[in-house]
Amino acid sequence: MVKAKWRSVDGIVLLNKPIGLSSNQALQRVRRLYQAAKAGHTGALDPLATGMLPLCLGEATKFSQYLLDADKRYLTCIQLGKRTTTGDREGEVLTEDSVPTLTDESLEEILNGFRGEIEQIPPMYSALKHEGKPLYEYARQGIVIERKRRRVTISNLTLVSRTEDTLTLDIQCSKGTYIRTIGEDIGEALGCGAHLHSLHRISTAGYLPENMMTLEEFEAIAEQGYDALDAHLITMDTAVEHFAKVELPESDTVNMMFGRTVPSPVSLEHEAVVRMYDQGTQRFLGLGQIKGAFIRPYRLVNTSEFSL
């Protein structure tokens, strides 16, 4: 397939990230397949992790923050009895302890302490920044930085299965939750230590897992040309479906796309954000913000260029 240098292509790709690649490496692989002029991911997955990584192409990058802020769901296997330097299986083993015998009731009591709103201390091996540098860079130098506790919400935590020394959990959580820290903290609650053996992101922002594809699948489709690839793009407005929908008549659409405030066809609370569409074509225009009886431009797409 002969490829142009870069092209204007807009939409969201649901990638099933393979193990061993950083999120940025995976993004660049997909970006090159699409030859997309602009691209960005929506929240990093560690190289050890697999699963859903929504990638925003073109104008969709304007809405990537909403996917970054969205709830996420994971399937994780926690190895009990061993603490590691990194909190996952790639680190050096620091301690080994015997795993206590647990009844279903005693285990459930411990797991219940990790449901709802909880506090976490972010791990040193994380991309969280301190004075402009990610924490993992300090950790690799043996430097420990004091981190503040963070409140996160675990909306669901289900025990899927267990063995004598592993727990497999299905976890749905808010933005900023470190599953690795949950694994380590469960190990401490059990008194034996633990680390993350595997991590798979099932979904982000309610996107269905059956809609994501592997790199190999995208590479095979790329052999058929851009039209085949573009058929697997998800429209960018799905990133902001949680906002109320507003349809504008043609005259207001034109004014809005020129950056002008227009009358609001709906009554919503002041400063509410809405997703806007042209009434006739149902074309997504971007986001607006309610100002009294009007809507002002908030985050608009470039209608002269976008393809979805």
Curated annotation (Swiss-Prot):
S-S bonds: none
Name assigned to this protein: tRNA pseudouridine synthase B
EC number(s) from the headed UniProt entry: 5.4.99.25
Higher taxonomy: Bacteria, Pseudomonadati, Pseudomonadota, Gammaproteobacteria, Oceanospirillales
Keywords carried by this UniProt record: Isomerase, tRNA processing
Catalytic activity: uridine(55) in tRNA = pseudouridine(55) in tRNA
Keyword Isomerase annotated: yes
InterPro entries: PsdUridine_synth_cat_dom_sf, PsdUridine_synth_N, PUA-like_sf, PUA_sf, tRNA_psdUridine_synth_TruB, tRNA_sdUridine_synth_fam1_C, TruB_C
GO BP: mRNA pseudouridine synthesis; tRNA pseudouridine synthesis
HAMAP family reported for this sequence: TruB_bact (MF_01080)
Pfam families registered for this protein in UniProt: TruB-C_2, TruB_C_2, TruB_N
Native species: Marinomonas sp. (strain MWYL1)
Functional summary from the UniProt entry: Responsible for synthesis of pseudouridine from uracil-55 in the psi GC loop of transfer RNAs.
PANTHER family documented for this protein: PSEUDOURIDYLATE SYNTHASE TRUB1, TRNA-PSEUDOURIDINE SYNTHASE
GO molecular function: RNA binding; tRNA pseudouridine(55) synthase activity
